[in-house]
From Swiss-Prot:
InterPro entries assigned to the protein according to its UniProt record, in alphabetical order: HAD-like_hydrolase_sf, HAD-like_sf, HAD-SF_hydro_IA, HAD_sf, PGP-like_dom2, PGPase_prok
Active site: D13 (nucleophile)
An example Gene Ontology CC term for this record: cytosol
Origin: domain of life: Bacteria
GO molecular function: metal ion binding; phosphoglycolate phosphatase activity
GO biological process, one term: DNA repair
Organism: Klebsiella aerogenes (Enterobacter aerogenes)
Pfam families membership: Hydrolase
Family matches, as Gene3D superfamilies: HAD superfamily/HAD-like (3.40.50.1000), Putative phosphatase, domain 2 (1.10.150.240)
Protein name from the UniProt record: Phosphoglycolate phosphatase
EC number annotated for this UniProt entry: 3.1.3.18
Keywords in alphabetical order: Carbohydrate metabolism, Chloride, Hydrolase, Magnesium, Metal-binding
Catalytic activity: 2-phosphoglycolate + H2O = glycolate + phosphate
Length: 253
């Protein structure tokens, strides 16, 4: 693993990498849709929409819900569009506001660390490697979630979706982290679970680790060709020359 020998810092994606946030996100999405009298989506579908930030999540949810409702109305012999519908752009604006309200209530209770995350972060931190977090999640939700999961203490730099002009898969947030840590891009390892993460790493010139257990729009992450592909989070430790315990966090915190 020659590329890993040059690593002097590590940055992580959040949703689908460190945290199983699907329950909380699904609750917020479905409550927002229900409030607008639209069909609810369910977790299996919402998982395929995660990864590009809240605006895109809401666009995907609304597009699906309107199509689903049109199909249901057609099956009942009704016009696909209700004359009383508000314009779609206004509906999207309201949906996003509703989502923010519901997610503020559901984020912490509906989010869980994936197996081995806390112990692995602790081991990397103890080695002296600077750790960073890069997420497309709206910035106001990030710090409270990290605090609730007791992992905020591990990160030197945290970049949320509102902290940059261009979110992943653009390289801007990764290059910003490298700058803040005084590292060359090739010295920063980026760990994520989606093609957005791998594309961002490639564009920034960073080494990448892809994790197979996360949210990747229903497609195999191997198709994105990360530098390394792991099935478990704690595989990072032996890859970086650190001890790996088989008993580390075999269940959610």
């Amino acid at each position: 693993m020659d590329k890993l020998q040059a690593i002097r810092g590590i940055a992580f994606d959040l949703d689908g990498t460190l945290v199983d946030s699907a329950p909380g996100l699904t609750s917020a999405v479905d409550n927002a849709l229900y409030a607008l009298e639209l069909p609810v989506a369910g977790e299996e579908r919402v998982i395929t929409w995660i990864g590009n930030g809240a605006d895109v999540l809401m666009e995907r949810a609304l597009t699906w819900a309107r199509q689903e409702r049109a199909t249901l109305r057609a099956a009942m012999g009704k016009p696909s569009v209700d004359d009383h519908d508000i314009p779609q752009d206004e509906q999207l604006r309201i949906l996003r506001k509703l989502f923010d309200r519901y997610y503020a209530e559901a984020a912490e209770e509906g989010s869980f660390l994936f197996p081995a995350v806390a112990d692995t972060l602790g081991a990397l931190h103890a080695k002296g490697l600077p750790l960073a977090l890069i997420t497309n999640k709206p910035t106001p939700f990030v710090a409270p979630l990290l605090d609730a999961l007791d992992i905020a203490k591990y990160f030197t730099v945290v970049i949320g979706g509102d902290d940059v002009q261009n979110k992943k898969p653009h390289p801007e947030p990764l290059l910003l982290v490298a700058e803040k840590l005084s590292l060359a891009p090739a010295e920063l390892l980026f760990v994520g679970d989606s093609r957005n993460d791998i594309q961002a790493a490639k564009a920034a010139g960073c080494c990448s680790v892809g994790l197979t257990y996360g949210y990747n729009y229903g497609e195999p992450l191997a198709l994105s060709e990360p530098d390394y592909l792991f099935d478990q989070f704690n595989e990072l430790l032996p890859a970086l020359g650190l001890p790996h315990s088989e008993t580390q966090e075999l269940k959610h915190d």
